[in-house]
Amino acid sequence: MLSAIAKPLRLGHAARQMTHQSSDSKSERLSPYQQAIRRFDAENARDPSTELADGVAQPRELLYAQRLTEWMLKLCPDASEELRLAARSQHLCRWMIPRSSYAMTRAGYLRWRTDLKTFHSQKAGEILREIGYPAAIITRVQELILKKTFPDDPESRLLEDALCLVFLQHQFADLAARTAEEKLIGIVQKTWRKMTPAARQAALGLPFAEREKRLLERALAQEQ
């Protein structure tokens, strides 16, 4: 009687072992790129801050990385692997270095932004090294994250276009609600100057609310 009960338990254990082995096998079959995206997303999924997307709360930096990738591929469907990796890791673990840890001054803000770029590039490099990427690819990804070749490098410009479009589509309205109008117009103008004609055209097609549309029109009118 005991052996009859124990037998199914042994089969269940064997089945669990097979499932575990199957999972490991699937992981081994992932390309380096797929492994990198999975690792980047797992890191960003740890962000304690959330943002609503389609009514669902999601980790903020995970959502940001996905949106940045989406825009980058809209602008350039055949983007290089290095560019796709840089887009997905652009804000990697950003919440670990909060703005509040720096002086609330212009100098403090600039230092924070500089340190963030260094942090993101180092973090991405560590993950890519663990996966086994060649040094040349890692260097290129870090170069794009650090914006070392902007604006002369077409790939760096493409990444900047995607960053600007994510801002205009997903962050502009929130910023407009808590920023003085004249200051906001300056921010929009600075953003617009960094964008290529293709990205500007894409931005003009975004479904802005009336207030944001008016602010954008004012900013662009002053640029002419």
What are these regions, as identified by a protein language model?
Residues 76-85, 132-144:
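Acidic/histidine metal-binding catalytic segments
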Residues 100-142:
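Helix-adjacent hinge/juxtasegments
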Residues 24, 28-38, 42, 55-62, ...:
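Divalent metal-dependent phosphate-bond-processing catalytic cores, especially two-metal-ion Mg2+/Mn2+ enzymes
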Residues 10-13, 17:
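Short, positively charged and aromatic/hydrophobic N-terminal segments
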Residues 52-56, 107-113, 153:
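A ubiquitous short alpha-helical element
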Residues 81-100, 120, 124, 143-149, ...:
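His-Asp-centered metal-binding catalytic motifs of divalent-metal-dependent phosphohydrolases/nucleases
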Residues 3, 22-25:
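Serine residues within intrinsically disordered or low-complexity segments
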